Amino acid sequence: KVRGLIQKKQVDNNVILAENAKKIVEERFGDPALSVETVCRELHVSSSFFSKVFKQETGLTFLNYLINRRMEEAKKLLDKTDYKSHVIGEMVGYPEPNYFSYVFKKNCGVSPVKYRKLEETKNGQ
């Protein structure tokens, strides 16, 4: 019974750790310096422990979670604003325009410029 309580507490702590990391991503995904190391320092845990727990709780590595969040925001900005692609890249944590285009295309299947054109066509603009 005691062992079960200890395991439950650990599970709860793991959930809290992952949620806190997700909050940090939400608040600072636009910071190009945001990394596993940064988050681990703030949450006072080792990177190996954190990486294991984060993947267990979210199904994603921290880096993939961060990239997904950045791409989600980039797509929203491409849809809803007229900002140039390189400006959007900077806003979501990629100050180097070519690298932003590379990551966007790798994750979304098309370049940011092409994505915007496809969305405009789809929305009849």
Outline where the language-model segments fall:
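Basic, amphipathic alpha-helical hairpins
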Residues: 3-10, 22-34, 54-58, 75-84, ...
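The cytosolic transmitter module of two-component sensor histidine kinases
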Residues: 14-18, 36, 85
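Short, Lys/Arg-enriched anionic-surface-contact patches
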Residues: 8-19, 60-66
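Basic/polar phosphate-binding segments, predominantly the helix-turn-helix DNA-binding elements
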Residues: 37-66, 91-111
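An amphipathic alpha-helical interaction segment
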Residues: 1-4, 45
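Short, hydrophobic secondary-structure boundary micro-motifs
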Residues: 34-35, 116
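Terminal helix-turn-helix DNA-binding modules in bacterial transcription factors
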Residues: 56-95, 117-125
